[in-house]
Amino acid sequence: MNRFLAFFILAFVSIQIDGLAQQKILNEAIERAEKEGFSGVVLVAEKGEILFEEAMGMRTYENQIVLHEDDIFELASLSKQFTAMMIMICKEKGLLDFDDPLSNYIEVPYPGISIRNLLTHTSGLPDYQSIMDEHWDKSKVAGNPEILEYLREYAPPKSFEPGAKYEYSNTGYVLLASVVEKVTGEDFVELSKAWIFNPLKMKSTGIRALEEKAAVMTFAAGHLKNGDGQFVNANTFHSSDYTVWLGNRKGPGRVSSNVKDLYKWDQALYKEKLVSKKTIEEAFTPFKLDDGFLSYYGFGWEIKPQSPFGKMVMHTGDNPGYKTIIVRYIEENKTIIILNNNAYPDMMRLVEAATLSLGKW
């Protein structure tokens, strides 16, 4: 994110650019991205009003079906903010506390880890995907119970002691989903609908199995370039196989949605529709490491204390053929959401242009 931080310095100087000029910056960036082959949807909003929303590219290249603004994308790691919210709701229901030991709920061979460590990627847990890739029978589909079983059986060492440093951990978010199931006795997928998606009327959002995705006509397939430089379905590549044999995992990914639903989610976080303002503020607070330094990852969100518009929280996602990002300038209620389905390499350039455009409309 160093490029983003450097951009902020420029943005502070440029933020007073004439409004029409700022809109032109975004329009030109969109046009350039489209010429470079970008396929996806971009939404820019401020204080409850959508200022810009545009789709470009293809839902499927094979059938030459054009993308629409309401099309549904894999969110990849943007899913973690929903998993974190499920934990926050559990906390407010009195089912757990953030500083509870993980061992209160889940048996794993890694003592000393708290729920907060899992939320903030400070647990030191090993990567579950590497374990499963080495040992799992890939003719079968694994989910959280199998992942937990293999963590216990093979018990690879931790990277560091809990709280010592930050290291991004998909394993931690698998365990968080399993904690939710343990304390509620409910399925995480169905409970996510009941606690988040249905109350917010996020009708296009869900944690879908592969066959469910195939049945959704408006689902934007992920694409990668083949040896001939043509975009083809990402599922034809060996590197995508894990999305099949880990197809039942819950917590670190698998949520699919569209930009309008994500904007409903964004706006709900200002209005205490799901949890209290106090809990949201804690979610957007850096974690203090054992050495006293701060780690700027909260509960499912990266945190930037300073930006052109004050405090910012954000997250990115990356699955085969998909790149996603949500940026929220929470002091001024400004939002940028970009969902891409052909692995566009320069998403941050679009974010930078959108940020400049938000200075004045």
How should these model regions be labeled?
Residues 86, 312-315, 325-342:
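Short, well-ordered beta-strand elements
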Residues 42, 48, 72-99, 173-181, ...:
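Active-site SXXK
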Residues 113-316:
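Short, surface-exposed loop or secondary-structure junction motifs
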Residues 342-361:
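Short, gly/Ser/Thr-rich active-site loops of penicillin-recognizing serine hydrolases
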Residues 23-73, 95-100, 155, 361:
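Short, conserved catalytic-motif segment at the N-terminal edge
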Residues 57-61, 246, 343-345:
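A short acidic/small-residue loop/turn micro-motif
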Residues 98-111, 200:
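Short, glycine/proline-biased beta-turn/loop segments that scaffold the active-site neighborhood
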Residues 1-25:
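Bacterial Sec-dependent N-terminal signal peptides
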